[in-house]
Design a protein with these regions (language model features):
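Bacterial N-terminal signal peptides
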Residues: 6-14
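Short amphipathic alpha-helical segments
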Residues: 39-74, 114-123
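Short, glycine- and small/hydrophobic-rich beta-strand elements in well-ordered beta-sheets
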Residues: 55-96, 131
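Sec/Tat signal peptide C-region and signal peptidase I cleavage site
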Residues: 15-20
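Active-site-flanking beta-strand signature of metal-NTP-handling nucleotidyl enzymes
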Residues: 26-34, 96-98
Length: 146
């Protein structure tokens, strides 16, 4: 029950944040996770579910007004000392997820579609537990593509 309450509050807060104070112009967001080794498999399961959700609800070639321009998840080991990789890794994994939409309408469509995704509560819990940074709402600044 506690998880349901947390998920509903996070969703409502997120939707209000996205449309408050001019943030309805957002067309991107991203977040970073620092995940201890013992939770990596669970996080990757959630991210795999998220990718399937994205593939089933988003288009990179369709209507320009709601088109997803880019979606990526990158991962890499957390270094003991980022200035000296020779010191090794901590065993944790860093993940960075980013999404960029052609227009704010695409971002709004994503927020609406996410309410029907069964793993949304798990994703939100993961972000709260392991999140070390987020850009939400975000605004596409620059890109370089092939």
């Amino acid at each position: 029950m506690r998880m349901i309450i947390i998920a509903v509050c996070a969703l409502l807060f997120g939707m209000n944040t996205a449309i408050a104070d001019g943030h309805d112009k957002a067309n991107a967001f991203g977040f970073a996770l620092n995940v201890p080794a013992e939770h990596i498999a669970d996080v990757e399961e959630i991210l795999t579910s998220h990718m399937k959700f994205m593939q089933s609800t988003h288009s990179v070639t369709g209507d320009a007004s709601t088109r997803l321009n880019s979606y990526s998840v990158i991962k890499g080991p957390v270094l003991v000392d980022p200035t000296d990789p020779s010191k090794g890794t901590t065993g944790a994994m860093m993940y960075i997820l980013s999404e960029h939409y052609e227009t704010p309408a695409g971002f709004a469509k994503h927020m609406q579609a996410s309410t029907g995704w069964s793993d949304l509560p798990r994703m939100q819990e993961m972000m709260m537990k392991f999140g070390v940074g987020a850009v939400y709402p975000g605004f596409h600044m620059q890109s370089m593509n092939r």
